Amino acid sequence: VAEVLGGEVGFIEPRIADHYCTGGDRAERKYHYEGALDCRAMAEHYGGDLLCQYGCLGLGSCVENCNFNALSMGDEGIPVVNPGACVGCGSCEEVCPSNVIELHSLTDRLLHFRHDHECVPPCTQLCPAQINIPAYVDFAAKGRYEESLNVIMERNPLPLICGRVCPAPCEDGCRRVDMDDEPVHHNYLKRFVADWDMAREDRPIPTCLPDTGKRVAIIGGGPAGLTAAYFLRRLGHSPKIYDAKPELGGMLRYGIPEYRLPKKVLDFGINDILRMGVDVEYNVALGGDFSVAELEKDFDAILMAMGAWDNSSLRCEGEDLDGVWKGTEFLQKRELGTHLDLTGKRVVVVGGGNTAMDA
């Protein structure tokens, strides 16, 4: 067909309808509307009846305008998208006067960072990964665990691990504290969904875009390097990790003990990323076994993800004496099997945080 039309064959990334509004029937109204049941007609009256200028007006004009039955109005009064039926025609986007519903590609979603018009809740604002926490909690509550997991994995590829070791800053900002004296335990829900995924047999590989032909070298196989490899692979690039250690994981493996993060769980999470098509070279260190100049010959980009292995100094006399170890140094030696004979000896642990308690 392309030859007949004089064009070229190429790949255009598909886009499907999506929206950010979660208000629906719960949203506050500024007047009672009794006009034509069309969002565009309502918008002509002072921008609609919502106090929120960015919210879904809820009359379903987008649903009426969809010719592929890809949209329906949900119980909350906001449109629900069926990704399998959406063809990305854009007819819903055209008739939405509030610009709530838009076409987004996989790249759009993976590279998205919050915008000021998106009414981001306090929990998501405090989440370092910017996970859409209300969405995955809602899916989990309805038993739609795979959809819950997909929401998490668009921002965080290591839910098995974070579900066990994340300090959960999101819960500090949970509005339920003001109502029930206790936050929604988002992190436990994340762990539950990830454990459910770990237990099932037929587990799909996350959707990846077609190969771009671009190769990226990642120096370091800790959480930063693994996360970068995951997103690069999903975007169609070919990442390769170079790590100085015999196994991947970085501080997750060599700094967090078994009782908090079982190695079986860690390995499962790492292998989930590797099976997407990520190459690895172990026991090689930058500056000794290879150089940046050598990598530049074979790769289109290089990512430095060596991590933050240096310990904070106590800035006190005697901290460099024999027999004084920094916390992460001690944990790393123990994990690597370095002989540390402390039998019958008294040990002082300075500090009271996670590292001190692990040591």
Report each predicted region and the residues it spans.
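Iron-sulfur cluster-binding cysteine motifs and their immediate structural context
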Residues: 1, 31-40, 44, 50-87, ...
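Short flanking/linker segments adjacent to small metal-binding domains or redox-active Cys/His motifs
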Residues: 6, 13-30, 168-189, 215-226
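Long, charged amphipathic helices and adjacent flexible linkers at domain junctions
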Residues: 8-28, 107-116, 120, 191, ...
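Immediate flanking context of iron-sulfur cluster ligation sites
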Residues: 9-17, 47-50, 113-122, 146-169
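N-terminal Rossmann-like dinucleotide/flavin-binding domain of flavoprotein oxidoreductases
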Residues: 149-156, 167-169, 189, 251-300
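Extreme N-terminal leader/targeting segments of oxidoreductases
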Residues: 160, 176, 180-214, 234, ...
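Rossmann-like dinucleotide/flavin-binding elements
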Residues: 217-242, 281-291, 296, 310-312, ...
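Glycine-rich beta-alpha-beta "Rossmann" dinucleotide-binding loop(s) and their flanking helix/strand
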Residues: 302-304, 310-332
